[in-house]
C-alpha cells in the first residue's frame, strides 16, 4: 500500500508521498481516479527539509526540474499546519531573462517559461497558443504564461504547463510573470496575480529573486494498492 497526501495550492494539485513504488504505476491510470488525479507527483524524503532530493513528475510522467507550489505544499505539510495554511511563502531565483521577438519574454526559474501580455485573456485558446509558440521557437520544453493588467497592481494570469496542460495556478509561472511585470513596471514592487485557482501575492526580492505568498490546502490523506494501477 502506498500512503499519500493530496494537496493543492490555488487549485494546482499534487500527490505527495515518500514511497517511490508509485513511479511503477501507470500515470494514466492514476489520473483516471478522481482521488488520485494530479498536476504533479512529488516524492520526498521525510528528513530532507531543504527538498534538495525532491523528485517531481508531471501528469504525463515526464520529470520536472522545479515546482514552487508543490514545494509550498510540502512546506506547509512539514510544518504540521492545519488543513488550510495561509500565506505560505516561497522565493524563486531568476537564472535568466531575455526579451524575445513579438513581445515574448524568456524566463528561467529552473523551469523554462515563455511569458507574454494578452489583450483578451479570457478568450485566448491557450493550448493553441502553446502549440504555436512551440513551433515558433522549435521547442516543447517550456511553460507558457499569459497575463493581462486588471487594475492598479492587480493582474490576471493563465498558464499552460508542459506535460500537464492548462493548470489553475503555477508557482514558477506566476513568479516568472511577476518578474516580467516588475521589469516593465519598475515603480511596482508588489503585485496580486489572480488565476482561476486563486490569488498569489508577489514581491520584488533583490534583482534576481521573486518572493510569493499563497494558500495551501490538504484535500485528502489516504493510501492505495499500487497493484491496481500497474
Would you name each region that the model predicts?
Residues 1-93, 97, 115-230:
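A glycine-rich beta-to-alpha transition motif near the start of alpha/beta enzyme domains, typified by
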Residues 98-118:
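Surface-exposed beta-loop interaction hotspot
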Amino acid at each position: 500500500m502506498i500512503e499519500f497526501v493530496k494537496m493543492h495550492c490555488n487549485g494546482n494539485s499534487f500527490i505527495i508521498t515518500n514511497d517511490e513504488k508509485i513511479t511503477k504505476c501507470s500515470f494514466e491510470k492514476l489520473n483516471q481516479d478522481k482521488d488520485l488525479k494530479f498536476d504533479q507527483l512529488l516524492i520526498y524524503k521525510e528528513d530532507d527539509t531543504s527538498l534538495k532530493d525532491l523528485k517531481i513528475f508531471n501528469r504525463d510522467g515526464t520529470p520536472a526540474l522545479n515546482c514552487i507550489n508543490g514545494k509550498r505544499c510540502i512546506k506547509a505539510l512539514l510544518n504540521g499546519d492545519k488543513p488550510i495554511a495561509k500565506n505560505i511563502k516561497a522565493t524563486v531565483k531568476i537564472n535568466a531573462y531575455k526579451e524575445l521577438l513579438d513581445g515574448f519574454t524568456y524566463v528561467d526559474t529552473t523551469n523554462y517559461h515563455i511569458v507574454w501580455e494578452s489583450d483578451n485573456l479570457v478568450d485566448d485558446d491557450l493550448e493553441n497558443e502553446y502549440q504555436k509558440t512551440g513551433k515558433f521557437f522549435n521547442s516543447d520544453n517550456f511553460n507558457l504564461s499569459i497575463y493581462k493588467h486588471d487594475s492598479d497592481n492587480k493582474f490576471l494570469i493563465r498558464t499552460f504547463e508542459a506535460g500537464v496542460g492548462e493548470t489553475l495556478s503555477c508557482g514558477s509561472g506566476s513568479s516568472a510573470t511577476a518578474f516580467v511585470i516588475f521589469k516593465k513596471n519598475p515603480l511596482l514592487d508588489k503585485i496580486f496575480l489572480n488565476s482561476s485557482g486563486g490569488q498569489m501575492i508577489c514581491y520584488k526580492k533583490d534583482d534576481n529573486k521573486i518572493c510569493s505568498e499563497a494558500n495551501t490546502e490538504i484535500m485528502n490523506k489516504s493510501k492505495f494498492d499500487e497493484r491496481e494501477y500497474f
